[in-house]
Amino acid sequence: MPIYFPATYSTLSSSALASWLEAQYFFADVRCRLLVMGVGDTYLAETATGRYILRVYRPSHRSREQIIAEIELLLAAKEAGVSVSYPIADRNGQHLHPFSAVEGERHAVVFSYAPGNPVSILNETQLRILGWEIARFHNVSSTVRLNGSRWTFDPETTLLRPLERVKPYFEDLPEEYDWWQQAAAKTITHLAQADGSRFSAGFCQFDFLPKNFHFDGDALTLFDFDFFGYGWLVNDLMTVRVHLDLDVHFGRLTREAAGQAFDSLLAAYREIRPLSDDEVAAVPWLSLGFWCFYMGFHSTHDVFHPLVQASQLKARTALIRKLLPHL
């Protein structure tokens, strides 16, 4: 029996996964190819009856219980009529599949395919559709009960812990790291003054950038809930604002157009569920947590290590300071 050298990460064979899909699911003529490496490796499976997404999670980043919670959330959203990419059961009614890989047990889930394409600059109709769909998702995510394995989005998890995690990477950038610390302290102080007990809470997707939803005409599908956790639901609207701010910075939108776009999204959202002015006022402050949280994640994942090198961190800090001038 061969003895393999220990590994922390392996990439599963696309052809072997295609054969597995044919045996495990009611799929025929499966062609499988790797799309992207991330927290989970994402494969496109093309079959005789349609396309599907296969995600193989990394055990270092997602536990079995955390993946089960994601499955439960998406099935609840689908049951409620929310347009999401949802888990597909196999011949035996199972959604979660263990694989014995070199680094240990990995888990895989097959998802429905999100038709259409990402749209970077949304028109008025698309903005309203997105606002409605996020609100419908929040109607589910604010009431669903899961297994307790997911994390919470709060100042500790979005600011303090990520900053501590990336501190070694800022060793040669003391001024930049000082700015992050001061900005985090200012944000925490400001948010503490808000009456957060009156903010709607539930499970947040925390990454509603255009790369995570597709439009096919006026039909919208939300996907990639891998980072979802519990927190103020306005965090999800904040992530849309983050993208609009980037559009302004890179000259794709004027500041006035970005403001109008966000107002359209909020108006549509409020047609489905309430949203207070205080929650909206928190958006610029919550934005720092978005950038800090994902910066911390980049330091934990080898694929993203180039993003935490000194040159990248210096450029990223300069960008965030321009995007968030109130800090």
PLM segments and residue spans:
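ATP-binding pocket architecture of kinase catalytic cores
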Residues: 47-146
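Juxta-kinase regulatory segment immediately upstream of eukaryotic protein kinase catalytic domains
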Residues: 1-31
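ATP-binding glycine-rich phosphate-binding loop
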Residues: 24-46
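Active-site activation/catalytic loop segments of kinase-like enzymes and analogous catalytic loops
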Residues: 234-273, 288-304
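A cross-family kinase active-site recognition segment
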Residues: 120-178, 201, 311
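Active-site acidic catalytic loop and adjacent metal/ATP-binding pocket
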Residues: 38-49, 53-54, 87, 188-235
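A glycine-centered beta->alpha junction motif in the catalytic cores
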Residues: 59, 93, 104-121, 163-171, ...
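ATP/Mg2+ or Mg2+-diphosphate-binding catalytic cores
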Residues: 3, 293-327
